[in-house]
């Protein structure tokens, strides 16, 4: 460990001048900013790097060209890293355990020191067991949500359909309350069953033996169980990345169908909740009432912006509509939660995706189908730029590939703006999981089939496309005149940003790149399924 620290210190000294010349900003949340537009003003980022050879242990891979450090994660990583206050937080799974007391399939949030990747602590959450009508925590996915950090607190949605507030110091500085039952919370349950009672989801659970806590365990400040508190029935995964504004925490719920995929157990459950960030108290729920219109599940994340003096919260619904809500909830009465009032909604499915020959087109949920035209939900995050919202539609990747759509809508409208708010639609892409990025009059988007699209932001006309021939889960990230794009086959593509298509480099990684690269304080962070890389031009 001492050798690692010395090597990291020497590397830091060598590249300090290079880093200080770049933008010195943290990246504290999904998208880096409330608009969720995946664009950074960082400069001096590398065009390429060499990931190096795999090391044994937990330190990732051997140092190589333009790599400041690398550190091992689990073996499936879908949530992006965030960097704040000298720490890095990233969700992964437990296939590469850092603590022998935590075995088996679990969701994990790891915390590292930003300067040298020293492991600080981890949140290790037991999986929810599938069975009967329940399949809300798909095997091996880990914690898929990207956390949000503000000051001394880290907020994240866990794989157990719960929002937790964590102390960024972990348990190293003691177990702060009010939540103090971490030992039992982290225990592997002996038995567990989820029942969809009419009154709300019910859990029959034998909690198992409490674990012995240590300084590298997470310190939970408070916990909000969405199944218990607002009757959410999660489908496949809980993946919303929370958004902080003032004292409010905005969270999308993972409510969806049950294991039969033909029934929504709790259609009255909210799409969005607002919590007090200090206490976890439920303050408000949305009034869109989409529960019985959910196609499959809800996996989008909220974005936020001020439009004509009014702060709006945007969210991609499980019914294929993009919604805008007034970000200031109306207070509740008689002990009931307040209301997030809908300002507008926009149908992101073109009419021909929903109706054919005067008849409704059924939602296509057959695994392995190809080219079948059908309506889709929104999995990506709505991206805001210059009073416009950009968002793609998509489906579970197991449903196969089929036509998708990138929509651009006018955020200044009100009501049902499916027609009045439509600026353009781009239908030359397939279903997408990716959040678009808007920079210098261009929109960069990717579809699951592996095609990267560059579209004119004003007209919606294609500027260029590039087929990576590799499935894409991640989102395009734009910085320093480059577009970084990861693929499931394990490559990081680097394109020149602009109207002329140019592939700068294609970097072979050690595993799938399903999370989105980010930059903070002059460093480019690239997560593969297995490893997080800190990339700096000139590092050796």
Descriptions of predicted regions:
Residues 22-540:
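Noncatalytic, solvent-exposed loop/strand surfaces
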Residues 7-8, 29:
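Short amphipathic alpha-helical "recognition" segments used for binding
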Residues 9-18:
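Bacterial N-terminal signal peptides
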Residues 1-7:
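N-terminal secretory signal peptides that target proteins for export/translocation
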């Amino acid at each position: 460990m001492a050798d690692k620290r010395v090597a990291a210190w020497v590397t830091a000294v060598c590249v300090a001048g290079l880093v200080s010349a770049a933008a010195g900003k943290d990246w504290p949340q999904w998208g880096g900013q409330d608009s969720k537009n995946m664009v950074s003003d960082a400069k001096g980022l590398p065009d390429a790097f060499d990931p190096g050879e795999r090391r044994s242990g937990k330190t990732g891979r051997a140092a190589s060209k333009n790599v400041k450090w690398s550190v091992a994660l689990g073996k499936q990583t879908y949530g992006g890293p965030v960097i704040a206050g000298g720490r890095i937080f990233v969700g992964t799974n437990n296939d590469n355990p850092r603590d022998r007391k935590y075995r088996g399939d679990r969701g994990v949030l790891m915390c590292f020191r930003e300067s040298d990747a020293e492991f600080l602590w981890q949140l290790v959450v037991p999986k929810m067991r599938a069975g009967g009508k329940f399949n809300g925590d798909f095997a091996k996915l880990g914690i898929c949500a990207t956390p949000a950090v503000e000051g001394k607190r880290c907020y994240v949605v866990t794989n157990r359909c719960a929002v937790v507030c964590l102390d960024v110091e972990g348990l190293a500085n003691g177990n702060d309350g009010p939540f103090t039952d971490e030992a039992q919370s982290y225990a592997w349950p002996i038995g567990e069953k989820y029942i969809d009672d009419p009154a709300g989801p019910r859990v029959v659970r034998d909690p198992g033996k409490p674990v012995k806590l240590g300084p590298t365990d997470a310190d939970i400040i408070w916990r909000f169980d969405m199944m218990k508190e607002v009757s959410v029935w999660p489908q496949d995964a809980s993946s919303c990345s929370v958004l902080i504004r003032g004292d409010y925490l905005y969270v999308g719920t993972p409510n969806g169908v049950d294991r039969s995929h033909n029934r929504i157990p709790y259609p009255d459950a909210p799409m969005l909740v607002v919590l007090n960030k200090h206490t976890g108290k439920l303050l408000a729920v949305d009034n869109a009432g989409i529960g019985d219109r959910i196609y499959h599940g809800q996996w989008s994340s909220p974005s936020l912006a001020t439009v004509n003096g009014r702060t709006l919260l945007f969210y991609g619904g499980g019914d294929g509509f993009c919604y805008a809500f007034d970000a200031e909830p109306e207070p509740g009465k008689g002990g009931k939660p307040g209301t997030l009032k809908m300002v507008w909604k926009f149908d992101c499915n073109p009419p021909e995706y929903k109706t054919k020959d005067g008849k409704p087109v059924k939602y296509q949920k057959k695994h392995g189908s190809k080219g079948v035209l059908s309506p889709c939900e929104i999995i990506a995050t709505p991206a805001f730029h210059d009073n416009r919202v950009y968002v793609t539609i998509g489906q579970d990747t197991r449903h196969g590939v089929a036509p998708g759509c990138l929509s651009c809508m006018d955020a200044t409208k009100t009501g049902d703006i499916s027609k009045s708010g439509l600026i353009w639609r781009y239908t030359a892409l397939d279903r997408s999981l990716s959040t678009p990025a808007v920079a210098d009059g261009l929109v960069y988007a990717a579809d699951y089939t592996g095609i990267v699209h560059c579209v004119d932001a004003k007209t919606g006309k294609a500027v260029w496309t590039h087929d990576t021939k590799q499935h894409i889960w991640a989102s395009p990230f734009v910085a320093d005149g480059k577009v970084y794009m990861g693929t499931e086959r394990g490559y990081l593509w680097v394109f020149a940003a602009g109207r002329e298509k140019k592939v700068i480099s294609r970097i072979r990684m050690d595993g799938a790149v399903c999370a989105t690269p980010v930059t903070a304080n002059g460093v480019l962070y690239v997560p593969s399924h297995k490893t997080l890389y800190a990339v700096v031009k000139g590092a050796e």
